[in-house]
Swiss-Prot record:
Its EC number is 3.1.-.-, 3.6.4.-. It comes from the Bacteria. The gene is mutS2. This is Endonuclease MutS2. One of its GO terms (molecular function) is ATP hydrolysis activity. It comes from Streptococcus equi subsp. zooepidemicus (strain H70). Pfam families: MSSS (PF20297), MutS_V (PF00488), Smr (PF01713). Residues 703-778 form the Smr domain. SMART domains: MUTSac, MUTSd, SMR.
Amino acid sequence: MEKKILEQLEFEKVKEQFWPYLQTEQGQLELDLLEPIANKDKIQAYFTELEEMAAIFVEHHHFALGGLSDVSESMQRLDLEADLSIQELLVIKKLLQVSAEVCRFYADLENVDLVALKALFEKIESFPSLQGSLQAINDAGFVEGFASPELESIRRQISNKEHASRQLLQDILKKQAAYLSESLIASRNGRSVLPVKNTYRHKVAGVVHDMSASGSTVYIEPRALVSLNEELTQLQADERHEIGRILHELSEQLRPHSRSLRNNAWLLGHLDLVRAKYLYMQAKQATVPVISDDKSLQLLNARHPLIQNPVANDLHFANDLAVIVITGPNTGGKTIMLKTLGLAQVMAQSGLPILADKGSRVAVFNGIYADIGDEQSIEQSLSTFSSHMTHIVEILNQADSDSLILFDELGAGTDPQEGASLAMAILEQLRLTNIKTMATTHYPELKAYGIETAYVENASMAFDNVSLKPTYRFMQGVPGRSNAFDIARRLGLAEHIVKEAQAMTATDHDVNRIIEQLEQQTLESRKRLEHIKEVEQDNLKFNRAVKKLYNEFSHAKDKELEKAALEAREIVDIALAESDSILSQLHEKAELKPHEIIEAKHRLKQLAPEQSLSQNKVLKQAKKWRAPRVGDDIIVTAYGQRGTLLAQLKDKRWEAQVGLIKLTLKEDEFSLVKLKEEAQQPKKRAVKVVKKAATGKGPRARLDLRGKRYEEAMQELDAFIDQALLNNMSQVDIIHGIGTGVIREAVGKYLRRNKHVKSFGYAPQNAGGSGCTIANLG
């Protein structure tokens, strides 16, 4: 990318706007080196990083890295086998700390899908061992005593010597107070001294280290203290030597990791720059543009980043459009619009967000060229025109169909007629070679060129005829018009002079009137578009409000369901605790009578919550599938028994075989059940209670008492009913025959007395009639 375009667009000033959002020197360095690139995939990767950083901030509003200084020079010193200073080690200590914090942050990161940033986060290494070693230096740069046993020992000796020195001085201070100018202990040349009056200097034996400016006081180190101070000085030298050894040891530990540390610093700096881009985007209401597959551009509400309170403008540069010519008078904002396009494109190709609305689109150009401003060269004795033309020639020689060219006041600085002709010829050459170009000019001849030439479009900047000031609103498709007559009239020029001037340029006046009508139509269209945008924004806000209400409702519903589930779990827990208590009571007894086990099982059954089968949604749904037919399997709603439909009677009544009993049922008294679905239902967990039985016989659903004596029949009946209850049988058959009726009556009396028998009756005629009793248990 040509360096001159960056200077003309003041790209460095734009980059300076990102400085307040940076936290690391490495990020600052990367920003300083940032320039536009022409690699579409690389630019898209930058944008993906930025979008993912936005996703991180949705979940973590205060994501930060902490201040980091540049470590590149320190790493070079490590590579050269040099030892690092305390300050350099502190910088690396901070780097290790931030690296560890970022690693932990990424490990805990949830609800954010990362692709581009994932690679960055996962490359950052943590060094807990090095981090632990560098704790020997605190944040103030003091090497802690625990850094080595030797340092700790030396400092303990220094402390003892200093204490002894102070004690000795205090004693001398008391004894020779009359000779002192002040009752205090001073320090000179790192030695503890006493301020002695000059007239008594020979009264205090010792070494003179200094004298006051007036000469009235001399600072003497008492002789008794000299040897003690010598020892202290030696210990302090030993301390410095030991600290140097510790710094060398720490440097040696860091040396093998210099490459990884340098890489960590770069990764953190890059993350910092991505973070700064996001914060800038939020603060400036910028956006990440879409990259076109062709050379088309679309800027929605684009703003110039270096202007305070800039006017936002739309720009549509279709793929087949080669040239846009902005015509009209000076000071209308033509150059600002030119630079707005250039900066948006340069920023985007540098991976930066642009000051425009969402939906904006940019292209990728191999070269962006501009001729903007007064380039007069005094040194080369070139006029403004010559300077511009020299630069234009260079641009034309370098540009191709993958270039974007920006011309400000093309053809200016020479004869207007010749300048206009040159401008048209240059634009025509660029149009024929399909090079995207935007040019500003005040030559009226170029308006006609823009109207008559294919793939060339006129544009202008709106002007307020009332205030006589430019509005800086970009009007694409409308050529600029002169406002000289209107301005002159409003400033007080005589009307007859204005009319005479208009008569001299009658044709131009007609053109201006047409242009004025186009301007009005454009402004009206823009107002309608702005109204549509306002409606869209209102709809968007409404949709967000509805979505928020829906989310709140869903959240409340989930909370209620969670509460209900919690209550259900509490009920189940209570039931399980009660069942465990019952089972514990059963297991505490070595021998249990059958009726005790039956009673316990009955209590366990009562723990289960009652459910009305008539309200069972699954069964209701099954019933709705189709009308019942003969042979269908059913469940009797009243007591949950399985049966089969035998025949359809009148009034929607059915005859059903339920066990050994035939029943007459209404259609709302049973539900259809599919065998396939029944097979797929999960089996219920059951608690098995094992009874010590006298025999090894299994459970029986039928008891035959024919030919039995009364006592024998009653014993077998009692054992049979107990066994049936233990095995959860709901229905049993008792065959007693007709005979004399003694056994039949005895069976009836027994069943009436047994509280676990719900009901009983004779079997149907085809199943034994009065010779067989069917008992329902529960």
